[in-house]
């Protein structure tokens, strides 16, 4: 079965796992997912992730969710740019999430990064998702 939005699927798995208080969730591996997970880990929204390779050539990420005092660190996570409606922004119009308390993850010519990094590097791009 083909998946039309692999990144959206990963975000949904994270959201559902956090709602059910799971310690970890699994998702098929891809390079875009790895770069988004790197940003989530560096910003402190997940504890980490590991890649598991299978004999059939496929791979899977196991994402360790992060909790603080019993509540998930991720309150909201959602896709902004979707396969049917891409959202591109310039550096001046990068959205802030919850007045800067959350992050927006962008895919830029300089790589996948958080909104504050894109502002520092003066680069815009596609708004992949927002996290709060």
UniProtKB/Swiss-Prot annotation:
InterPro entries: Ribosomal_uS8, Ribosomal_uS8_CS, Ribosomal_uS8_sf
Keyword RNA-binding: yes
GO biological process, one term: translation
Alphabetized UniProt keyword annotations: Ribonucleoprotein, Ribosomal protein, RNA-binding, rRNA-binding
One term of GO molecular function: structural constituent of ribosome
Signal sequence interval, chain numbering: none
Gene Ontology CC entries for this record: ribonucleoprotein complex; ribosome
Domain of life per record: Bacteria
Pfam families according to UniProt: Ribosomal_S8
The keyword Hydrolase appears for this protein: no
Subunit structure: Part of the 30S ribosomal subunit. Contacts proteins S5 and S12.
Described purpose of this protein according to its UniProt entry: One of the primary rRNA binding proteins, it binds directly to 16S rRNA central domain where it helps coordinate assembly of the platform of the 30S subunit.
Entry-linked PANTHER family: 40S RIBOSOMAL PROTEIN S15A
NCBIfam families: PRK00136.1
Family listed: Belongs to the universal ribosomal protein uS8 family.
Protein name (Swiss-Prot/TrEMBL): Small ribosomal subunit protein uS8
Organism: Agrobacterium fabrum (strain C58 / ATCC 33970)
